[in-house]
Design a protein with these regions (language model features):
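Second-shell loop/turn segments in exported
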Residues: 5, 73-82, 177-186
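Conserved polar/disulfide-associated segments of primarily extracytoplasmic proteins
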Residues: 30-150
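Stable alpha-helical elements in mature extracytoplasmic
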Residues: 11, 83-87, 91, 188-195
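Short N-terminal segments immediately surrounding and downstream of signal-peptide cleavage
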Residues: 1-14
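Primarily extracytoplasmic ectodomains and periplasmic/lumenal surface modules that are beta-strand-rich
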Residues: 13-27
């Protein structure tokens, strides 16, 4: 519950919820939960691609790459959002201003923004792509992260952020995926939009 309001967080299609009752899941939930608290945020749940989650639990792979995290800022937990539309547009404007800071706003089309961020990102850092889409139910932004791993070498990851309002509470839905191409990124964005639609349907 968020500030006394009960909110349902259904896992996206093909994803399964991490459970505190499973040791591997509990470790991840605890670690990501602690990282969120350091950013003055609260993690409410995580889900991952079902097959990746099963393999991870069996010790056959590292943490699933395809994940969804549901969280909010601690300030948002008690705040009642009177106008969801205004809240979303304000948050999107803040993200657009951040894009201006990094120069990504000067690039007109989304695919070029993504490819530019991938070209510029350094190892063990991240590059802000900018706002990817906005409508009355959510604002969507992206960043590209490149990490060096001991076993798999350099891995480039996509991190999509969506900001929405459920039952007058501001919620962040993060979608993590391996980066493969700009077109594949737009597919992941489409799936995240489906996740947001399902969240709204579950919390009418």
């Amino acid at each position: 519950s968020m500030g006394g309001v009960s909110i349902k967080l259904p896992a996206p299609a093909g994803f399964c919820d991490l459970s505190p009752g499973h040791p591997a899941d509990n470790r991840a939930l605890t670690e990501f939960g602690a990282a969120s608290e350091k950013e003055a945020a609260r993690l409410f749940g995580m889900s991952a691609a079902c097959q990746q989650l099963a393999d991870w639990r069996a010790g056959k792979r590292p943490l699933p790459d395809d994940r969804v995290h549901f969280q909010t800022s601690i300030a948002n937990m008690t705040e009642v959002v009177a106008s969801p539309k205004a809240f979303i547009h304000t948050m999107c404007a803040l993200l657009r201003a951040k894009g201006n800071e990094f120069g990504s706003a000067a690039v007109p089309d989304v695919k070029s923004k993504i490819e530019g961020a991938v070209a510029n990102v350094k190892v063990n850092s991240q590059e802000f792509v900018g706002v990817m889409a906005e409508d009355d139910t959510a604002c969507y932004a992206a960043r590209i992260m490149k990490m060096r791993t001991p076993t798999d070498g350099d891995k480039t990851h996509l991190h999509l952020t969506s900001i929405t309002v459920l039952k007058n509470k501001g919620i962040y839905v993060f979608r993590y995926a391996p980066y493969t191409s700009a077109d594949a990124t737009l597919d992941v964005l489409g799936k995240l939009k489906d996740t947001i639609a399902a969240l709204h349907a579950a919390n009418k």
